[in-house]
Amino acid sequence: MFSAQKPIYGNGAGVNMGGGGPSTNNPGSMSMPGVPTSMGPGMNQQIPSGGPMLMGNTPNNNNSNENGENNGNNGNNGGNDANATRNNPNMVNNRGAVHALDDPNVYHWICQLTYGPQKEQALLELGRKREQFDDLAVVLWSSFGVMTSLLNEIISVYPMLQPQMLSNNLSNRVCNALVLLQCVASHPETKHLFLQAHIPLFLFPFLNTTSRQRTFEYLRLTSLGVIGALVKNDSQDVITFLLRTDIVPLCLRIMESSSELSKTVAIFILQKILLDDVGLQYICATLERFYAVTNVLKDMVEHLTVSTPPGRLLKHIIRCYLRLSDDLEARRLLKIVLPAKLRDNTFTEVLRDDVGSKRCLAQLLLTLNEETS
């Protein structure tokens, strides 16, 4: 039931949805409220002389450095890593999972990331290995200084979040750091530690940018990917955390004005929030929040055309409306604000091969007592 209470969201995206999250209106600010100074295990320890302390058994340092340098010089170690994995049975456990620390190159690049001269290359190489090793996220989180190094990469670019100041190289470097954060955010053993450390708050200055330059689009898209990894597995703890931030208004603004790919990830995050009972209750708690969401969804529908295939956007839009209709008061209002293009046959041909979306749209119209043809 909607109430007349004032919204408790901030207006980070230009929508009146209340406050409670960190201030994201000044991307150049180096201070992120609510973020603890210690972001992971061992952050306040002294750096050991022999290299970073890693989770589990570490390979021989000499072999690690030698192999890492050789592969770095070759510039293409993907095939070599795969061959090494196949030829070394010790790298595979009884269940067939490959351990990251059994690969000496992982150790080498983590050493480089924490205090070596090849940090930029380390970000790239470790990002390439995230699909190869299931436990890379645990290694990244548990290894001395790694999370601090990743956060330093992110914080260092805050003063550059202005047009003409953010270079392609710097944007790519930060995106590579964000890819590793996404790896940590998506792993079941590190996801909640990632949240407890409030690390997602460090991404909000990137989400709060509005420039359409490619460098900024990449930052927004990769930052959205980290949030998307958090919400992917329907954890109420994640949703509850995000609802205390400005993520909803930021996603709404991106859905209004960013690239189609960024819009798709942003609406995916919104859909995941709505699918959670806490998220649905939150959005439907006030008229301001409800209309902030439905107005953006309506504008997105109006900009979709049959000549330009809407891709996954239409699919997510329909599912957001369908979930909103589960709230009785929202259902009554949806009968008034649902776009005409979803009531008629505008997207019939577009949805012809999408059985799931057709079914969701039919269910939505039936729920709203609409006639379907």
UniProtKB/Swiss-Prot annotation:
Principal subcellular localization: cytoplasm
Positions with biased composition (Gly residues): 11-22
* Pfam families noted in UniProt: Rcd1
Q: What else does UniProt say about it?
A: Present with 18800 molecules/cell in log phase SD medium.
Q: Which organism is it from?
A: Saccharomyces cerevisiae (strain ATCC 204508 / S288c) (Baker's yeast)
Q: Where in the cell is it found?
A: Cytoplasm; Nucleus
List this protein's GO terms for biological process.
negative regulation of translation; nuclear-transcribed mRNA poly(A) tail shortening; positive regulation of transcription elongation by RNA polymerase II
Instruction: Indicate the family of this protein.
Output: Belongs to the CNOT9 family.
Protein name per its UniProtKB record:
Protein CAF40
**What ranges does the record list as Low complexity composition bias?**
50-88
The family database entries (InterPro entries) matched by this protein are listed as: ARM-like, ARM-type_fold, CNOT9
UniProt xrefs under Gene3D superfamilies: Leucine-rich Repeat Variant (1.25.10.10)
Q: Lineage of this protein's species? A: Eukaryota, Fungi, Dikarya, Ascomycota, Saccharomycotina
Annotated region (Disordered) at: 1-91
This protein's record includes keyword Membrane: no
- Share what the entry says about its subunit structure, partners included: Subunit of the 1.0 MDa CCR4-NOT core complex that contains CCR4, CAF1, NOT1, NOT2, NOT3, NOT4, NOT5, CAF40 and CAF130. In the complex interacts with NOT1. The core complex probably is part of a less characterized 1.9 MDa CCR4-NOT complex.
- Note the PANTHER family from the entry: CCR4-NOT TRANSCRIPTION COMPLEX SUBUNIT 9
Q: Which gene encodes it?
A: CAF40
One GO CC annotation, please?
Answer: CCR4-NOT core complex
The record describes the protein's role as: Acts as a component of the CCR4-NOT core complex, which in the nucleus seems to be a general transcription factor, and in the cytoplasm the major mRNA deadenylase involved in mRNA turnover.
- Report keywords, A-Z: Activator, Cytoplasm, Nucleus, Repressor, Transcription, Transcription regulation
